Design a protein with these regions (language model features):
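A generic structural signal for nonpolar/compact residues at packed positions
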Residues: 55, 108-109
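A generic secondary-structure signal marking the coil-to-beta-strand transition
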Residues: 23-26, 51-53, 143
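Signature for HUH/AEP ssDNA processing cores
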Residues: 33-103
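Conserved His + Asp/Glu catalytic blocks
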Residues: 101-106, 112-190
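Residues in well-ordered beta-strands of folded domains
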Residues: 28, 56, 94-96, 135-137, ...
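DNA replication initiation on ssDNA origins
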Residues: 1-43
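Generic recognition of cysteine residues
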Residues: 3, 24, 30, 48, ...
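Alpha-helix initiation and N-capping motif
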Residues: 24, 37, 75, 118-122, ...
Length: 190
């Protein structure tokens, strides 16, 4: 989808002045393109691993934050605990925190690259979460697209949130980063 409000870029290189349009990065079309790019990156990352899972983490009533909002540190701590349980095996992840559409109840979706969908992994994920319910399934293109939408700020309906609540967010593994394997495998790259 083409940018709805392209920005004119004026560039001079070796004495030659060039004017060209670049995407604004803010309009709905740009955010949709960005989301689609991240969904593709998640799918490419998934191709690097034999198995990948999609996990949903929800709070039970005893562990629901007060006020009931997303807590990014809960997600970070979960990933750290899970890494400790699976060491020395390393895995990568892409995660988002969102609110339920009807109840605004906070929960998290996590794509775990390199982990199989089996009872032992489910047991370890449940133990590492420790704050409520867990569901695990195979990663699909639709699920990759679903979590990718949270990389776009302001694409969700944040005006429905009470003032001061944590906004919906995305977090992912860093270094070497998604697509690194693709870059290295290209002829003539790096």
């Amino acid at each position: 989808m083409e940018c709805l409000f392209p920005v004119v870029q004026d560039e001079e290189n070796a004495g030659v002045r060039t004017l060209f349009n670049r995407p604004c990065g803010y309009c709905e079309a740009c955010r949709l393109t960005y989301r689609q790019t991240w969904a593709a990156r998640i799918q490419l990352e998934a191709q690097c691993h034999a198995e990948n899972i999609f996990v949903t983490l929800t709070y039970d009533q005893d562990h629901l934050p007060d006020p009931p909002q997303l807590v990014p540190d809960h997600l970070s701590a979960f990933v750290k605990r899970l890494r400790a349980r699976f060491a020395p095996l390393q895995f990568r992840f892409f995660a988002c925190g969102e609110y339920g559409s009807r109840t605004l109840r906070p929960h998290y979706h996590v794509v775990l690259f390199g982990l199989p969908c089996n009872a032992e992994v489910e047991r370890q994920v449940l133990s590492a979460w420790g704050a409520g319910h867990v569901s695990i399934s195979q990663l699909s293109p639709a699920r990759a697209s679903y979590v990718a939408k949270y990389v776009c700020k302001d694409i969700s309906d944040d005006d429905k949130l009470p003032e001061g609540y944590q906004r919906e967010f995305a977090r992912m593994s860093r270094n070497p980063g998604n697509w690194c394997w693709f870059y290295r495998s290209c002829s003539g790259c790096g």
